[in-house]
Amino acid sequence: MRTISYIAVHCTASPQSWGVKELQKVFEQRGFLRPGYHYVITADGEVHPMQPEGLIRNGVKGFNKETINVAYVGGIDAKGKGIDNRTDAQKMSLRKLLSELHTRYPHAKIQGHRDFSPDTNHNGVVDPWERIKECPCFDAIPEYADL
């Protein structure tokens, strides 16, 4: 079993109406044989296991060996701009799944994909201007600090 240091929260940067089939098609179009997430949560709150936790996925460059990747479907508005548009069902399911994962991996840090960006000013915080990307379009660290 691999050592898990992180549980990364992602958004799919896709319409909220998408399901697993649409996501798999996009991954295939990008040249990936398998989805980059271990779990995906659709707008109705359903948790879809995509890959076994023991498999290394391509969710966060440089951290994949030690990360479980979880995504909610959505994260962009009609113009493609990043937005936290999680449904109430997604919020509830995401919290429950992250709690279960953190129970299995109690030393893992729960954070958003954007929080893996380098802290270029070394103040201990990834400031908005330091972020390589906005995913998951909300601040996951304080939201799940109680888990």
Segment roles from a protein language model:
Residues 56-60:
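Flexible, surface-exposed loop/gating regions in the mature catalytic domains
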Residues 33, 63-65:
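Short, flexible loop/turn motifs enriched in small residues
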Residues 1-12, 66, 75-147:
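Basic/polar, cationic surfaces and motifs that engage anionic cell-wall
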Residues 1-55, 133:
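Short, conserved "active-site rim" segments that organize catalytic pockets and cofactor/ligand binding
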